[in-house]
């Protein structure tokens, strides 16, 4: 990545409550991504291995912006910002072609904060957003990315007149990853409103309600969705022959796509306390988290068919947790600081699965309730002086095991979900630093 920035700021004029400040600027970025397979990979020296395709991608981003801070009255500040971005199409100098198209958008943000008193602050904001997909999401050539995590029936078994490229019975099919040239940028509207209250110098409470609405949200069609409705997602199927296979079979293209709309709403909250304990030191405690009110999205290919993953394993092969919070207590005694951290995620309904009941020998459909998951972490820091310190920490202090889940979206990582719980159990680490 190469780039440059230019910025300038200064006071425009003065109001009774203070000076009105204006800042302007511009930035330029050139992103470059190159892949060159080795000669051995290209020439087949490596047994049973397909060389990755060669490419050399580049893209330019330009942006200009302006921001102003206005002291409306004593204690009340307003902020307004405007930005314009242009993101060029992607050039592949190796294959001598372009991907996507040049995209431009203007976005803005309005915010205000009102210091009602020394103890109470009110705040709020509203704005728009623009986010272009990364280069690989648009222009990466199709490559083999292993196989589907679960076994599926043939997506297109045919009408009996020929021999479709199906695998026998239920099987894992090759999964391909690559770019989607038709991928569009995400656009969003978001707003927040909240407060911070400090009744004493040793205690504070804060809460912010937030809402984000996405248009042309970038996500993907899961293998479950595609194999569950292959007719609707026929464009995501092709044929592919692995080096070890005698013939090509159907393969699933796991590409990023614009799923349509997404709506997320929640409340971020925090309690914090501080006190000095004679003979022990400074004790600081905080409790913060997010309460998710809504997390919905449209099914790929639709504009108003909403579904969600709130408190359950959703069609997008993910979970939106109703409650996530962290509690932390630190005691600083001279040069030594001890910190204990508690991390929590609420439980959820697992993916519905068909399993064999060993007591009856028959298949049955079940859906587990995955319990809440929490861990304790410890960290001790000793500062020898301003330059040197040593850290000793224990992650997952009480060796909590990941909760059982029957989801099958992570290949051979079965029985737990590595996105939400670590299989490493208790982990001890030691580190040090010296600044000079």
Predicted regions and their residues:
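Outer-membrane beta-barrel transmembrane domain signature of Gram-negative proteins
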Residues: 1-79, 301-330
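Transmembrane beta-strands of outer-membrane beta-barrel pores
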Residues: 12, 28-34, 82-88, 126-132, ...
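Short loop/turn motifs that connect adjacent beta-strands in outer-membrane beta-barrel proteins
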Residues: 13-21, 72-76, 119, 201-202, ...
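Surface-exposed extracellular loop regions of Gram-negative outer-membrane beta-barrel proteins
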Residues: 22-31, 36, 56-115, 119-186, 188, 209-244, 395-415, ...
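Outer-membrane beta-barrel signature, preferentially recognizing the C-terminal barrel domain
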Residues: 57-59, 132-206, 247, 252-267, ...
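C-terminal beta-signal and adjacent terminal beta-strands/loops
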Residues: 204, 293-294, 343-356, 381-436
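Gram-negative outer-membrane beta-barrel transporters
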Residues: 204-352
């Amino acid at each position: 990545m190469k780039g440059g920035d230019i910025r300038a700021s200064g006071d425009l004029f003065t109001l009774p409550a203070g000076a009105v400040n204006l800042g302007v600027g511009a930035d330029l970025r050139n992103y470059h991504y190159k892949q060159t397979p080795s000669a051995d990979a290209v020439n087949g020296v490596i047994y049973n291995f397909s060389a990755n395709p060669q490419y050399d991608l580049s893209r330019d981003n330009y942006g200009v912006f302006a921001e102003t801070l206005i002291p409306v009255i004593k204690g009340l500040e307003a902020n307004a910002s405007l930005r314009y971005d242009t993101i060029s199409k992607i050039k592949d100098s190796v294959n001598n072609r372009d991907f996507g198209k040049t995209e431009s958008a203007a976005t803005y943000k309005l915010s205000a904060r009102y210091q009602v008193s020394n103890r109470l602050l009110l705040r709020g904001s509203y704005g728009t957003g623009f986010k272009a997909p990364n280069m690989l999401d648009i222009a990466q050539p199709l490559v083999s990315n292993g196989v589907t995590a679960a076994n599926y029936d043939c997506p297109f078994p045919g009408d009996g007149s020929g021999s479709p490229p199906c695998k026998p019975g239920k099987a894992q099919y090759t999964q391909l990853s690559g770019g989607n040239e038709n991928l569009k940028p995400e656009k969003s509207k978001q707003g927040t409103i909240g407060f911070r209250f400090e009744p004493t110098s040793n205690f504070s409470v804060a809460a912010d309600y937030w809402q984000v609405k996405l248009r042309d949200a970038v996500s993907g069609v899961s293998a479950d969705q595609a194999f569950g409705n292959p007719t609707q997602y026929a464009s995501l199927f092709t044929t592919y022959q692995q080096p070890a296979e005698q013939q090509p079979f159907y393969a699933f293209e796991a590409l990023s796509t614009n799923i349509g709309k997404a709506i997320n709403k929640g409340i971020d909250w925090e309690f914090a306390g501080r006190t000095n304990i004679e003979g022990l030191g400074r004790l600081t405690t905080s409790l913060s988290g997010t309460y998710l009110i809504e997390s919905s999205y449209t099914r790929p290919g639709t504009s108003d068919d909403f579904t969600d993953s709130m408190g359950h394993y959703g069609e997008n092969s993910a979970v939106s947790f109703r409650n996530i919070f962290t509690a932390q207590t630190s005691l600083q005694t001279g040069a030594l600081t001890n910190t204990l951290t508690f991390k929590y995620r609420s439980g959820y309904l697992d993916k519905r699965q068909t399993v064999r009941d060993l007591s009856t020998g028959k298949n049955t459909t079940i859906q587990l309730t995955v319990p809440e998951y929490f861990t304790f972490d410890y960290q001790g820091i000793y500062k020898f002086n301003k330059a040197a310190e040593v850290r000793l920490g224990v992650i997952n202090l009480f060796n909590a095991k990941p909760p059982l889940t029957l989801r099958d979206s992570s290949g051979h990582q079965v029985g737990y979900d590595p996105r939400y719980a670590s299989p490493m159990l208790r982990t001890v680490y030691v580190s040090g630093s010296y600044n000079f």
